[in-house]
């Protein structure tokens, strides 16, 4: 694997292999010393042009557990804020000897540009580009679902027949896009639920079912997982729904809807959460919730991605 830019690029076998290596990395996390020398001598740069807490820290933890050297770059306070181009930034990192670059950028397609430009000879990981994709989030979501379904027998398995309902601001969600492609590649059945104003143009070409009524979607064959998406108000330049209270009433996972879910249905959220809007506090904190598991699993999955990207080996050094 040279780069990880989109979940659409992954075959089923490739996706399952990443999840299996992530299982090995999760085992590393159970040791007294939670490190492996797999990437000793390698340099990973976290190149973030957008604010991030969970993703940046998760990638940093992943790289350090693999014994890589980590450089954190933030656009704020850097030469980028003075007008430096992506090309010049990439060439600077090339001169510094970066082996892997984790990129988050507000412009859709920026990681693809970086990977195909020839400006830098490094493995590129897309950590979120505009409203396009966020592949490692989808991988950690798939990893979480697979572990909940299969436990210690998860290795080698996909998500065949698993029903996943993704609810909320699909229009602005790179998480929804990456999950739509990855989960279906792994065999899951995905339903998107959103207000008509928050459904993107062209969704008919996605391998998903689209619904506008959350209650009907939840009632049609109990889902195995319900994933709530954050309302991304910072990306909205118009009124996409009447008001927050109305949104929560029609499309939020409130206490009443939580009580109607099947006994084994899990509740997911990529974070950060707007409690009381897309998800109630009771749902977020319930035993069904995998929010904290997703954070922990994110480190294991990102360890797997960095390992496969930078080591050139398919077997983790355990």
Swiss-Prot record:
One of its GO terms (molecular function) is amino acid binding. One of its GO terms (biological process) is 'de novo' UMP biosynthetic process. The keyword Transferase applies. Its EC number is 2.1.3.2. Carbamoyl phosphate binds at residues 54-55, 104, 134, 137, 271-272. It is an enzyme of class 2 (transferase). L-aspartate binds at residues 82, 174, 230. Pfam families: OTCace (PF00185), OTCace_N (PF02729). InterPro entries: Asp/Orn_carbamoyltranf_P-bd, Asp/Orn_carbamoylTrfase, Asp/Orn_carbamoylTrfase_sf, Asp_carbamoyltransf, Asp_carbamoyltransf_Asp/Orn-bd. It catalyses: carbamoyl phosphate + L-aspartate = N-carbamoyl-L-aspartate + phosphate + H(+). GO terms for cellular component: cytosol. Pathway: Pyrimidine metabolism; UMP biosynthesis via de novo pathway; (S)-dihydroorotate from bicarbonate: step 2/3. The keyword Transferase applies. Keywords: Pyrimidine biosynthesis, Transferase. Belongs to the aspartate/ornithine carbamoyltransferase superfamily. ATCase family. Heterododecamer (2C3:3R2) of six catalytic PyrB chains organized as two trimers (C3), and six regulatory PyrI chains organized as three dimers (R2). Catalyzes the condensation of carbamoyl phosphate and aspartate to form carbamoyl aspartate and inorganic phosphate, the committed step in the de novo pyrimidine nucleotide biosynthesis pathway. This is Aspartate carbamoyltransferase catalytic subunit. It comes from Clavibacter michiganensis subsp. michiganensis (strain NCPPB 382). The gene is pyrB.
